[in-house]
C-alpha cells in the first residue's frame, strides 16, 4: 500500500493539497492510475476508462435527473392538512433531517474525495452524485414551500434541533477527518 499513497511532485501552480492542480498539462494515462493519490488529472477523457463501472453509474445518475417543480403537490398539501400534529411533527422533522443530510452529501464528497481523485470517470461520478444530492435537497425545499405558508419558519429551526445536529455530527466527522489531513 505504500506506493498507493505516495504523491507526485508538486509544481508551483498547484494548490495546498499536495499534487492537486486545476489542469495538469502533462499527459496522464488514467487507465494505469490509482483511483486516488495518482498524478493530478489532465484532460477529462471519457473514451477510455480504468473502471467503466463509474461511467455507467454516472450515466445512470444522469438518467434520473428531474426537477422538483415538475411534480404537482396539490394533493400533498391537502393530505398534509389532514395530518395530526404529531404526524406533522414527524413529517417536518424528517424533511429537516433530509435537508441537512443532503446539504452534507451535496458538498462533502467534492471537498473530501475529489482533491485526491486520479481518474476522470470517478471525478465525474462524484460530481454528478453531489449534483443529485442538491436536487434531493431542492425537492424537500419544494415540499416545504408547498405545505407551509412561511418556509423560513422551518429552515430557521434546522440548526436549533439537537437531534439533527447530533445526527449531522455522525455523518460529517469522517468527512472532516479526511478534509483536515
Model-derived segments and spans:
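Charged/polar, solvent-exposed surface patches and flexible loops
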Residues: 3, 56, 60, 64, ...
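Extreme N-terminal leader/anchor segments
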Residues: 6-74, 83, 87, 118-124
Amino acid at each position: 500500500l505504500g506506493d498507493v499513497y505516495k504523491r507526485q511532485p508538486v509544481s508551483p501552480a498547484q494548490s495546498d493539497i499536495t499534487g492537486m492542480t486545476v489542469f495538469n498539462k502533462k499527459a496522464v494515462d488514467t487507465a494505469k492510475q490509482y483511483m486516488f493519490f495518482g498524478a493530478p488529472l489532465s484532460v477529462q477523457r471519457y473514451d477510455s476508462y480504468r473502471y467503466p463501472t463509474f461511467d455507467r453509474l454516472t450515466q445512470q445518475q444522469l438518467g434520473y435527473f428531474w426537477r422538483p417543480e415538475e411534480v404537482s403537490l396539490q394533493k400533498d398539501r391537502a393530505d398534509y392538512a389532514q395530518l395530526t400534529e404529531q404526524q406533522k411533527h414527524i413529517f417536518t422533522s424528517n424533511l429537516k433531517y433530509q435537508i441537512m443530510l443532503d446539504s452534507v452529501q451535496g458538498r462533502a464528497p467534492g471537498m473530501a474525495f475529489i482533491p485526491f481523485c486520479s481518474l476522470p470517470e470517478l471525478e465525474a461520478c462524484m460530481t454528478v452524485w453531489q449534483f443529485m444530492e442538491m436536487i434531493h435537497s431542492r425537492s424537500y425545499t419544494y415540499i416545504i414551500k408547498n405545505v407551509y405558508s412561511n418556509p423560513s419558519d422551518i429552515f430557521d429551526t434546522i440548526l436549533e434541533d439537537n437531534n439533527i445536529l447530533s445526527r449531522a455530527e455522525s455523518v460529517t466527522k469522517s468527512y472532516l477527518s479526511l478534509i483536515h489531513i
